[in-house]
Amino acid sequence: MSNKFEILMNQLDMPLEMRNSEAFLNAEIEKVLVHKVSRVWEFHFSFANILPIEIFRELQKRLAQEFSKTGNQAVFEIHCQAPQVSDELLQAYYQLAFEEGPCASHGFKSLYQDLRVHLDGDKLLIEGASTIDTEHFRKNHLPNLSQQLVKYGFPQLTCLVQHSDELTQQQAENFQAENDKIVQAANEEALKAMESLQQMAPPPEEKPAYDFQARKAAAKPKLDKAEITPMIEVQTEENRLVFEGMVFDLEQKVTRTGRVLLNFKMTDYTSSFSLQKWMKNEEEAKKFDMIKKGAWLRVRGNVEMNNFTRDLTMNVQDVQAVTHYERKDLMPEGQKRVEFHAHTNMSTMDALPEVEEIVATAAKWGHKAVAITDHGNVQSFPHGYKAAKKAGIQLIYGMEANIVEDRVPIVYNEVDMELSDATYVVFDVETTGLSAVYNDLIQVAASKMHKGNIIAEFDEFINPGHPLSAFTTDLTGITDEHVRNAKPLEQVLKEFQEFCQDSVLVAHNATFDVGFMNVNYERHGLPKIIQPVIDTLEFARNLYPEYKRHGLGPLTKRFQIALEHHHMANYDAEATGRLLFIFIKDVAEKHGVTNLKDLNTDLVDENSYKKARVKHATIYVKNQTGLKNIFKLVSLSNTKYFEGVPRIPRTVLDAHREGLILGSACSEGEVYDAVVSQGVDAAVEVAKYYDFIEVMPPAIYEPLIAKEQIKDQEELQTIIRNLIEVGDRLGKPVLATGNVHYIEPEEEIYREIIVRSLGQGAMINRTIGHGENAQPAPLPKAHFRTTNEMLDEFAFLGEDLAKKLVITNPNQLAETFEPVEVVKGDLYTPFIDKAEETVAELTYQKAFEIYGNPLPDIVDLRIEKELTSILGNGFAVIYLASQMLVQRSNERGYLVGSRGSVGSSFVATMIGITEVNPLSPHYVCGKCQYSEFITDGSYGSGFDMPDKDCPECGHKLSKNGQDIPFETFLGFDGDKVPDIDLNFSGEDQPSAHLDVRDIFGSEYAFRAGTVGTVAAKTAYGFVKGYERDYGKFYRDAEVERLAQGAAGVKRTTGQHPGGIVVIPNYMDVYDFTPVQYPADDVTAEWQTTHFNFHDIDENVLKLDVLGHDDPTMIRKLQDLSGIDPNDIPMDDAGVMALFSGTDILGVTQEQIGTPTGMLGIPEFGTNFVRGMVDETHPTTFAELLQLSGLSHGTDVWLGNAQDLIKQGIADLSTVIGCRDDIMVYLMHKGLDPKMAFTIMERVRKGLWLKISEEERNGYIAAMKENNVPEWYIESCGKIKYMFPKAHAAAYVMMALRVAYFKVHHPIYYYCAYFSIRAKAFDIKTMSGGLDAVKRRMSEIAEKRKNNEASNVEIDLYTTLEIVNEMLERGFKFGKLDLYKSHATEFLIEGDTLIPPFSAMDGLGDNVARQVVRAREEGEFLSKTELRKRGGLSSTLVEKMDDMGILGNMPEDNQLSLFDEFF
């Protein structure tokens, strides 16, 4: 027995005979795992053999008893060195496994616990009678049985269940004997009963006719009176259970045979369950349409283990919709409350409900108004504004702000006095809590110091008149023994005042110590402190701002001052005094401050607000002026004054207080703090700053009792009464507010999961208790309360006062708020002088240049139509701004690609915003402006028309036109705000962003803000973390339910990758939104809109200045080749050949592993689109547009166009590919343009099956009348989303330019591809030749097949596909060259590519550039020099050496003896 195990046995007081038995002869404790949060101690024991069952049970019992004394749990596992197993021992442990296993059902245990077990080699045979359901047992117990036995020390056994003839016979005999007894007893009872009945029987009555239908109805299962089983109680398979709960997830599947399976999940809020219901067909499924998300159902069925999900699932037999109890506000109309303190999911990682839920709940309960008060932000305002208008109730806009003092003083009661001459009393107090009003002084200690020397000391304990709590003793080290015979408080106070005469008082965090002393002085009729007081906490913060922590502990450690017993006043006081004289010396040397009166003026930093204690206050918008002011406050607090949290200095709040109303907030507010720490009189002075006082239900404050900040419920009620008194004294309304963080009480767990995910570093998760018993304090019950629930909370105040606080005062205050416009109703574009004239002039100028003057009618009418919409709706400035950005990027040498539908606008084409021409396919002569338009739909793209010479002058005609209607951009009436998305080169994007600032001004240009919420996968992780940290176990359905509840809460903010919001220069940003930094990064170059940009995108101009690889690639290819990309034809035969085979590349499909030449071609190079190309073999530009649309749409290709093409019903050119095709096709068929447009809009948004049947049938009838085929109509019904044709055209044009170089200038193409597009490299493989490349590709392919490939390997496979193709085409990869390789780009050397340094794994761009700079300074003479000058790590140098890059380079450049001789 090891020493550790022996100590444990003594601690457990194990019986001596067991302790000395052979079982513990070689016993050891292998390890102990302590799970602090769940308070579980996990022992791992090692024994020579399996313990006798009675010793095991005794060890288990004593461990559990011993650890439960401290609130912990003990579990253990056993490892046996040479286990010897007998059948008798095995039988005993088999029964123990049942007792401790998860099979909770009594019926299950009674059936299987007493089966006979024995060993056969390494197999555990379990035998039972033939009546035993071995399959049921195998599924429900075997998986756990083997695992349980291993924990007991048994070896890993294979468990088998089988029937035994012997046991079957024995069971039959026992059953017969028992049955004979039962029958005999029953017969005897029956005879007695018959005799009694015969004596009492009335005359026989005539039997009613047999009613089959009535009997059948009566036999139908009824669930109304069925016993409902809580889901939490079901841990194993059971039959005929009834659940009642809410459906929170639903999926319907139809099998190939037509059967319908409904998989759904329900919760009863004790747990959650997976359920499934099979139905014969979809017709039968309609009978169960009550199964839908949000529905409350009562269901009956059998619970079985699902072999696929490996979780218990109910196979549902009966379903009944039930009415679920909903909380209602039971007070009559006119007597309902108004909630003035509610948080939405925009309170970062703190609250759950969307603002729409809060508004809807208030409206449902008949409340006339509700306020929202998120922490430090107003991001729920826009959605709240729309929700309140829809619900028809008043929304009061507010926030819970963090208020700080601008400059926190170091000295109070300052006087003119030299610091070096003063006498100081450095003191500290110990108390039973933080409240000077409700807690007691238990120690006052001080050191009187002069010139750095202690000249007198004061140290007195004080008897509080009651036993000290464990918390106080743990924290301070002061026990009841210390204070039992101490002096009375009043005597200590008088003696201390005398001790302090003619001295400067000093304390660390002096406001607490001085506040405590003053309250006690006043209570005993003694004068308050009037002499100077120095706060060493603020002294340190201002003197050493570079330190992260300024607590007494960290400071004494930093300055090497002894602090033996922190939180005992005498030790703390002496340590503080030692620090004081260090500070006095440093402040004189660093800042020249030597006088007490100069500390505040010369040392207190203007940024001292950053360290000031934050106090909460609720700020509400009273009118439109207040809205703008709260926007300014939010902006300043999130930018200029942000420090950890958004802070509002008091003077800043004062400067912007017009139109705002201030409430005193929660227990983190200064009014509450003053009431608790200083008393009502002091709180009255503080409360003068506020417009109303908030009190909250006792349940909201109850966690403070757990934290021992409040003694009990009685003291809590006194605090609430005192808060009410503060308001009454000042004549300010007192409002009962709920501090709402979720709607329903059962949603508390979701907030618990979110908050605990922040970890113990978050203030809200600070633990109470010490050591293993430390746990986060409970969270308050913060659901949205009805009026009657709120009145119940405040019933202790009496009915009249409770109604005043809950109903009267909130309603009266709500009436003082004016309506405000949070979101503007119009678009406000910036002003650019003569924008309309410029757009029109540029348009016609370019049109005349191309098409001549006068313009062809088709061109003239299109321009007139577009300009009428653009200029008439104020969109000219949007067009002109985009044109200016594109022009500037073009001037820097980059093409700009368009996205979205802007290519539908011919004006955009003419002024250079897009290169997509949306006119009908046409010819035009570049010499004489002759033009010819094809308007019959015979060509899908002008690029597909045959070449033709000009009939007027013989010059070769240009071909263009994609046949895209303008309506798809600005709507049928041309009044939809244009959304112009532009793809700039990623290299040029930062310059383009700065162009926006340059054009409009930095005070008017902001990055488009985004709000990041907790995603479903993240929420799942939070739930699993909570499960782990707090010792929970949830089945899969419950994890999913909890994750759904926790998802959607704001987690961070960010910025759109290219979106820039432009504020009109005749307004300011606060007319629309506050501003902030993305993700609270105050070092960011750009500020963002505080609101999610979608919330204001119809009010201000948003430019999408996006970064993309295509323009960068084109620029690179142009630089390499000198070819102008605008000269590349869109109908090059060689390029089109790529889409039908590999011959044009000079390779076979076997060589490159794909039947076409699509590898590395933008838009067409993914596996998905390559598969589409293989199936369709496009031959025209129009068909490539179709492919682009099909690949980007949802339910456009799969299960739709793909099937139509396979079945020969349609071909690639006729299926629906892009959204615009629908309108154009239907117009060509003869439909009215307005109807064609409307049908397109319904289909592209996936609304075809969601609109009314009447509307849809009207469209279908019109389509059929115009000979639109049936398959086309059915195809429309399947579509969920469609890609704009203009977007497809822009992408395809870029793709074909890249493909042109792949066909005709391959080395340039591969150089550009690897420099710009490739994401992962393996230089050793790439330079190793074809065999090495193909071998590595095979390795990764095998991994991908088994889902074992990493993301990097998947990216590398894509790179190697292109490498393989390049090598097969006869080009080569060189090795990295220390003196040739570029930092980040591949270089061409004949038919060989030289890789850059950045392609080497682990070598970043910055280090690569450093290597290039270093080599320009001179040759590297050694590896040591390469490391130092090139900034390379030893690992990277070793890699270079392994790859042969360094040749024979020596380790260092010191000459050896031999070097000198030779």
Swiss-Prot record:
Q: Does the keyword Hydrolase apply?
A: yes
Q: What is its EC number?
A: 2.7.7.7
- Pfam families, from UniProt? DNA_pol3_a_NI (PF14480), DNA_pol3_a_NII (PF11490), DNA_pol3_alpha (PF07733), DNA_pol3_finger (PF17657), HHH_6 (PF14579), PHP (PF02811), RNase_T (PF00929), tRNA_anti-codon (PF01336)
Q: Which CDD domains match?
A: DEDDh, PHP_PolIIIA_POLC, polC_OBF
| GO CC terms | cytoplasm
The record's Gene Ontology biological-process terms are: DNA-templated DNA replication
Q: Where in the cell is it found?
A: Cytoplasm
SUPFAM superfamilies membership: Nucleic acid-binding proteins, PHP domain-like, Ribonuclease H-like
Q: What range(s) does the Exonuclease domain occupy? A: 424-580
SMART domains membership: EXOIII, POLIIIAc
Purpose: Required for replicative DNA synthesis. This DNA polymerase also exhibits 3' to 5' exonuclease activity.
Q: Which HAMAP family match?
A: DNApol_PolC
- What NCBIfam families does this protein map onto? dnaq (TIGR00573), polC_Gram_pos (TIGR01405), PRK00448.1 (NF001688)
User: What's the protein called, per UniProt?
Assistant: DNA polymerase III PolC-type
Query: Which species expresses this protein natively?
Result: Streptococcus sanguinis (strain SK36)
